Swiss-Prot record:
Cofactors required: dipyrromethane
Protein name, per record: Porphobilinogen deaminase
InterPro entries: HemC (IPR000860), Porphobilin_deaminase_cofac_BS (IPR022419), Porphobilin_deaminase_N (IPR022417), Porphobilinogen_deaminase_C (IPR022418), Porphobilinogen_deaminase_C_sf (IPR036803)
Subunit details: Monomer.
Transferase listed as a keyword: yes
Biological processes annotated in GO: protoporphyrinogen IX biosynthetic process
Any GO CC annotation of this UniProt entry: cytoplasm
GO molecular function: hydroxymethylbilane synthase activity
Residue list for modification S-(dipyrrolylmethanemethyl)cysteine: C241
Species of origin: Staphylococcus aureus (strain JH9)
Amino acid sequence: MRKLVVGSRRSKLALTQSQQFINKLKAVEPNLEIEIKEIVTKGDRIVDKQLSKVGGKGLFVKEIQHELFEKNIDMAIHSLKDVPSVIPEGLTLGCIPDRELPFDAYISKTHTPLSQLPEGSIIGTSSLRRGAQILSKYPNLEIKWIRGNIDTRLEKLQTEDYDAIILAAAGLRRMGWSDDIVTSYLDRDTLLPAIGQGALGIECRSDDEELLTLLSKVHNDEVAKCVTAERTFLAEMDGSCQVPIAGYATISDQKEIEFTGLIMTPDGKERFEYTMNGTDPVELGKTVSNKLKEQGAYEIIKRLNEQH
């Protein structure tokens, strides 16, 4: 096997994820020679704005995809939730490895459970999806935007006027934070995850047979089916970062997929949700999307997209 170059965002989390995946590859192919090339993306350069205000899909992947096309790198290791639902022609997701915990972590300054926070408590999050679901369940709380990496957010929780913050459990775990700092992991009934949350997507050129053969050795087919249902739903709903959208699929021992799709307004007041079981992930994603459109969810998406 030739020497491989892996493209990664420059953040600590991205580099850690990349190294962890490289270790996984070396476990099945010990003689691999792999180097990481750090790439700065548009999303990394914008640190002072709410990402949904910046607009556009693929804020964290476009520059990396460009490097793949230019053959400066052989593969890219993305957080799947950052990858738009349509992959450019000539590129492919070569594998979906094992999924980390897909839920969100709730961290309270005083370790107060979410349901017991006093009225007017301020929760920091960078996601419309989290904000909308929290306001829907706990309209007495306030949402305040927070940006920055995990360390920055944990520091802001202590030094600024946040009572709690919510962030992806997967990032905390991959960075080696212990469960001690987490007040609770929020289950799907409290906070339905983002599309592809906790999963990685390994992107490469579609014609790179040698690499695709290697990647197939660390591919998790069950996770791939689940995230395919989620990403199909995202594509069908035309969900952009202006829309609070969530979707989560699980697979049973009998290989049946259960998928829940959710669309909300940012204030949490309108909620469209549907759960369905099936065996074909693409059909499942499409059908749940159609059900939500019948309920009126598409009107919300059109309205929110037009406002930006």
